[in-house]
Amino acid sequence: MQRLLTPVRQVLRVKRAMQEASFMPPLLPPAAHQRFSTVPAVPVAKADTWPKDVGILALEVYFPAQYVDQTDLEKFDNVEAGRYTVGLGQTHMGFCSVQEDINSLCLTVVQRLMERTQLPWDSVGWLEVGTETIIDKSKSVKTVLMELFQDSGNTDIEGIDTTNACYGGTASLFNAANWVESSAWDGRYAVVVCGDIAVYPRGNSRPTGGAGAVAMLVGPEAPLALERGLRGTHMENAYDFYKPNATSEYPLVDGKLSIQCYLRALDRCYTLYRQKIEKQWKQAGIERHFTLDDLQFMIFHTPFCKLVQKSLARLMFSDFLLADSDTQSSLYKGLEAFRGQKLEDTYANKDIEKAFQKASLDLFNKKTKPSLYLSLHNGNMYTSSLYGCLASLLSQCSAQDLAGSRIGAFSYGSGLAASFYSLRVSQDASPGSPLEKLVSSVSDLPERLASRKRVSPEEFTEIMNQREQYYHKVNFTPPGDPNSLFPGTWYLERVDELYRRKYARHLV
């Protein structure tokens, strides 16, 4: 028995010595166990130890080389003129043939980002993909993208795919920023990729489709810095939009519920963001409400442009309910009849919707409309929609116009997950500055959109039928001509009998 107890005594002796040397705290008495918490009394890391201004350093956008005109689609679908162009606020819709899938879209946008920035491939230490376009239930898009890093020998890259409807891109951006600010950061860049192919069966939902991808370079000293501590997030269980059928690209959609979920999430995220920024202000000695006036620009996840206009009006309504009733601001002139309402009781109130859309029109034109250029001409890009709006804003404004501004951003993914956060733009807009370079890099967006091929609704419908036919098919070469793609585009070359996909790049 003595021999058996000896090792235990040795362990206790070592533990006691460690306690005396202050390597570990002494064991707590039994009564204290109930009060024990792993939460430190003070922050582990001080603010001045974090990398400064972590955010978006560079940005690249990809969209397909063909589109269908929404006016043509209205005629083809035998609906009244204006249903898609006015009712949805859309003019054109980009789409992919069978030659392109989510892997090829992401390959293209990452390659373009790295070529534009001229960064070495081994300078990336984090790569994460946000998408809801799933073509394999196990193998991630991220693993396919690793092919781009093969020649550099860089396999030490963290991150993986993130999925929840249209929210995955934002989750990936937050994760990348968290990595840069963490003890795991090794000084390299993070790359965030978000992309999707949004397709619907023929009918009322089809005109809300689109396709595209965005890649963002994330690191410190960024011209678009994520404001620390200023995120309002709301998540809940809802069946507004979901994809339970793995044999089809098409979702199940409750359109009315989805819009209500979007607006409810917007209300709650905006309220939480307001509370957090007002708390920061209070600590700095500032006592006032946060309003839209504190955002120079406001971008939204954009299923269709008309919903975004309603959403900005919704934020104005939220500000209005908090404003003093005796406020003489001309902004709220004629709206006093709507005092005393509760946000949660007004989602179906058309009078409030119309009144605040009218009252907020100038704010919309100034703060949000410039961000809708890509959405207007390409449609919904799901996870990359919000970041396509960011690219549009940068392409429609000068560096001087953007310098020093705060950009509000609302991200929404059905099911549902949503966040409201903000980006602080660098003050330096001088020639050659990071901000000026970023703005210049997307200045060709209108020109690139104008260079696409216009396709008839008949041909568009045939291509959609082909996508149905080849979805999850094996041992085939996709129909189509690679020469119809933009130069430098990756495309699906073949799927073999074991579902393995081979990709090639169209000549630059």
Curated annotation (Swiss-Prot):
One of its GO terms (molecular function) is hydroxymethylglutaryl-CoA synthase activity. Homodimer. The keyword Membrane does not apply. This is Hydroxymethylglutaryl-CoA synthase, mitochondrial. The modification N6-succinyllysine is found at residues 52, 256, 310, 333, 342, 350, 354, 358, 473. SUPFAM superfamilies: Thiolase-like (SSF53901). Keywords: Acetylation, Cholesterol biosynthesis, Cholesterol metabolism, Lipid biosynthesis, Lipid metabolism, Mitochondrion, Phosphoprotein, Steroid biosynthesis, Steroid metabolism, Sterol biosynthesis, Sterol metabolism, Transferase, Transit peptide. Its EC number is 2.3.3.10. GO terms for cellular component: mitochondrion. Succinylated. Desuccinylated by SIRT5. Succinylation, at least at Lys-310, inhibits the enzymatic activity. Transmembrane segments: none annotated. Catalyzes the first irreversible step in ketogenesis, condensing acetyl-CoA to acetoacetyl-CoA to form HMG-CoA, which is converted by HMG-CoA reductase (HMGCR) into mevalonate. Pfam families: HMG_CoA_synt_C, HMG_CoA_synt_N. Residues 1-37 form a transit peptide. (3S)-3-hydroxy-3-methylglutaryl-CoA binds at residues 80-81, 166, 204, 208, 258, 301, 310, 380, 414. The modification N6-acetyllysine is found at residues 243, 256, 306, 310, 342, 350, 354, 358, 437, 473. Pathway: Metabolic intermediate biosynthesis; (R)-mevalonate biosynthesis; (R)-mevalonate from acetyl-CoA: step 2/3. Belongs to the thiolase-like superfamily. HMG-CoA synthase family. It comes from Sus scrofa (Pig). The modification Phosphoserine is found at residues 433, 440, 456. InterPro entries: HMG_CoA_synt_AS, HMG_CoA_synt_C_dom, HMG_CoA_synth_N, HMG_CoA_synthase_euk, Thiolase-like. It catalyses: acetoacetyl-CoA + acetyl-CoA + H2O = (3S)-3-hydroxy-3-methylglutaryl-CoA + CoA + H(+). PROSITE patterns: HMG_COA_SYNTHASE (PS01226). It comes from the Eukaryota. It is found in: Mitochondrion. GO terms for biological process: acetyl-CoA metabolic process; cholesterol biosynthetic process; farnesyl diphosphate biosynthetic process, mevalonate pathway.
